[in-house]
């Protein structure tokens, strides 16, 4: 279908809100983003990393999804059956914490509601906030297939979760056991490592005496957590530490509790650290837990789930753990067993959701046995069907993690999430694990816990495609997916888990490529955070500058694997770029004279400038396509920017004005064809980055088809590549630029004619310059041009050297030398004053000692700048005086 627009529907000024209005809804109504499931077309699929259904998306989400959308838009235009699948994550603890906080405002707890009613309330929250997220996706212009939208708690995905849990359990790869986990005493749940934020805290090392039972002395131990002392069941020393050889096997009398505990030898102990003797608390430290297992030590839990001390803590029973810390230290002092307290900066885990200090805690939990699953996943990386990491260095990061993996605690003490499909017989204690409920359900009690959110999101690439139904058309056609786009901070928590679950349950990699990006940082390179107040709401940026400005800035702002430094200046620069495109497009449209798509005719292209711009267009198509395949979107952005701003806008459009404003109708029509053809192809190349403004411009141009979203991706036309014209135009551009620079140096406006002498390098360049002298005349305004091997620079000439020639412009023809010398001497006086002023500051000791370093540094930069300018003016004065 061909749509013609003979009227220009583009306002004088680019207004993003007007350009973007209505387009997304129209795209959805027309189902441009709906995957066909057409097996005759090559499939290309990306599943969106599901955002937590907890509210606003941040700049990292905007970056992540923009990259995904660029890839899928490009592939759609290249003829692939493209699926960009949307969805959201139920985000167990994050969502439950939000809902509980909301209930707290009404003085209601989840326990007041009961489990079923609380879960219903959370579903209401989900429906409300899911709509917010969709609105943000719309604002960004994401080409999502909403007919396939999924949620990690929907029925299909829940079936997949049960199937995986039961299968792994039956294989002995899921088990229930007591291990040290991250415990949030405020939320009263286990936490995954990613839910623990480590902060450097000014704490203390407490050095204490542990008396030997036989009264012969004591061992010095040091701890940052005295509250765990009641749980000590041994003191460990290194087996080769000569200081303690005679004590191995003897016992300590644990102070305060007066419990006898052994001295054990273990290589875990670092002899050089502290006294070389370490207290072992197997129920409250992961390393001590391992030591305890090796020596069959008892595990004594000394805290309740809320972080208060329990009866195993003796006299400290009922105290908050941090109150107990103080009292225990005081008791050691009273007993004469306190040695010293040293300040100690150390990393302390805090719950991401509640802010509580995380407690390493021995707890009965469900675990996935990781070693065999990791081994399978690592074997995949040795085959042709491996996951390709972009950049490749992250494959090593992934492999190192998998080589050193620990069993995965998958149970959470929450109500919102996939409830563990395990039931306990009320009388016999028998465990039943199954995809369906046990018979005689009233005799059984289901496990109260839910699964870690990452358990369901690890199945995301294939569960969203209908698995475990392997006959599902989407699973058959779109799995494995093509590209996962995600940050390097979740390679361990998500990427690795998707790979091993996919290998285990489908025998396939979950995605062919994983494009790893960094973090969004502020302009100073700092991580964005509430405490720094440097966070940026992407919707606010869109409201001010438009989605296209934000998308292009994010997509082109860094290389794969690198962090992105965000600044409003960069967005504004993109906004200026779009304005340039807008104005250039309006110029083209105003000069097409109602040209229709089928009237575009490139058969009469003879002008060097026309051949050159078509050559540059094809070089740009080649570069953008190739770089896009490698995910080098920063380079794509630079390539498009240079072509559009420099080649098309600054040069070709200016050159095109000659025939457009002339009398030759054939030349006019050819120029219109080249303008329309080039701008149309350029908009298609730019479309994945700037979907809204390119649709607007494309709809106004002569075009074929209903929307640019489904228009054909430009292909290289070898017949349009003319290297001879490229060389010629490059030479002309260099000459014109050099002449303009000389004019600028001596303050001579373009309106004043000059004498121009050009000495070509060889006959090829002489031919180029002579055959295209009209360009030099048009853009240099010479009253006389000489192109000859015989010309030489006169003493008064300003000179420039370009790749194909030397350029001479006699100065006396440009300026009155005496007037110019007087002007320069006045300018010299100005720079002398500036140099004196800034050096006065820098020679002032008070200024140097009191001013901030940044201010002093700025003054030093000014001094260098002013001295350089002064030297330049002096040099010009001396040159002119010699003349």
UniProtKB/Swiss-Prot annotation:
Q: Which domain of life is it from?
A: Bacteria
Coiled-coil ranges per UniProt: 811-847
**Compartments in which it is found:** Cytoplasm
Binding locations of ATP: 530
Example of a GO biological process term: valyl-tRNA aminoacylation
Indicate which residues form the motif 'KMSKS' region.
Answer: 527-531
Which molecular-function annotations from GO does this UniProt entry contain? aminoacyl-tRNA deacylase activity; ATP binding; valine-tRNA ligase activity
A Gene Ontology cellular component where this protein is annotated is:
cytosol
The record's catalysed reaction(s) read: tRNA(Val) + L-valine + ATP = L-valyl-tRNA(Val) + AMP + diphosphate
Question: Recorded E.C. number(s)?
Answer: 6.1.1.9
- Identify the PROSITE patterns for this entry: AA_TRNA_LIGASE_I
* One Pfam family per UniProt: Anticodon_1
Which keywords, in A-to-Z order, does the entry hold?
Aminoacyl-tRNA synthetase, ATP-binding, Coiled coil, Cytoplasm, Ligase, Nucleotide-binding, Protein biosynthesis
Q: Where is this motif: 'HIGH' region?
A: 51-61
EC category: ligase
The free-text domain remark for this protein reads: ValRS has two distinct active sites: one for aminoacylation and one for editing. The misactivated threonine is translocated from the active site to the editing site. The C-terminal coiled-coil domain is crucial for aminoacylation activity.
| Subunit and partners | Monomer.
Question: Which HAMAP family has this protein been placed in?
Answer: Val_tRNA_synth_type1
Similarity section: Belongs to the class-I aminoacyl-tRNA synthetase family. ValS type 1 subfamily.
Name of the protein in its database record: Valine--tRNA ligase
Q: Which organism is it from?
A: Listeria monocytogenes serotype 4b (strain F2365)
Q: Which gene encodes it?
A: valS
